[in-house]
């Protein structure tokens, strides 16, 4: 990674450190000098993001970087930032997640993540069990199994009490193994029930927000589609 990208990452992380309840979800070990994948996944409370958005945009613009792709969905805001270096373009993608959810159905909110974040001297990050929960809850809800390439993560997190309690609260199962063998439609219905029992008004609002952003981004938009290739996350 170039010094230009490393400085850009350092500047944005510095802003987040000073102003936001956030954490980097994964692939944070080499930052800012070594970014394992072009995109950097941030879990952040919606309140924190709204409060620092204008400062973030000012920082990006004042440093010579340009936002070349922008996506705003119900659970995620993406900035693909580019910097022209003559014959090539430096790219850094920031993915700001407000929660782990599917179709507006909340599985785990950012506030649940960031209250357990750790600091390594440069950035806030999530421990393995929370990295696992983010991926596992989402994958099972959409009908996918946990990726084999993250088997090491599953092995480390599967017996963790926090993991067991969260999966039980969302999907009403007693173990990961049980969850693996239940149809995703049943898991989603259980997640919906858990949401409406705990926070009925918020649950309705989340689904409406999903529908509104989906229609705006993919049905009413006339900007077309783009295909991007990123590294492992």
Predicted regions and their residues:
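Hydrophobic anchor at the beta1->P-loop junction of P-loop NTPases
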Residues: 227-229
């Amino acid at each position: 990674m170039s010094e230009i990208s490393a400085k850009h990452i350092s500047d944005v992380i510095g802003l987040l450190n000073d102003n936001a309840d956030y954490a980097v979800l994964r692939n944070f070990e080499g930052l800012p000098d070594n970014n394992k994948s072009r995109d950097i996944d941030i879990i952040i409370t919606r309140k924190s993001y709204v409060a620092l958005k204008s400062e973030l945009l000012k920082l990006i613009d004042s440093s010579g970087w340009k936002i070349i792709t922008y996506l705003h969905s119900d659970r995620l805001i993406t900035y693909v930032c580019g910097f022209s270096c003559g014959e090539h373009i430096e790219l850094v993608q920031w993915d700001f997640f407000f929660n782990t959810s599917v179709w507006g159905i909340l599985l785990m909110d950012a506030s649940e993540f960031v209250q357990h974040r750790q600091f390594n001297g440069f950035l806030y990050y999530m421990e393995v069990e929370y990295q696992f929960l983010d991926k596992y809850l989402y994958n099972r809800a959409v009908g996918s199994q946990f990726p084999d390439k993250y088997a090491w993560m599953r092995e480390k997190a599967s017996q963790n009490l926090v993991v067991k309690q969260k999966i039980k609260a969302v999907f009403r199962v007693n173990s990961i193994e049980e969850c693996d063998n239940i149809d995703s439609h049943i898991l989603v219905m259980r997640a919906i029930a858990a949401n409406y029992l705990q926070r009925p008004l918020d649950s309705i609002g989340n689904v409406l927000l999903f529908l509104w952003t989906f229609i705006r981004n993919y049905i009413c938009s006339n900007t077309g589609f783009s295909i991007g290739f990123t590294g492992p996350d």
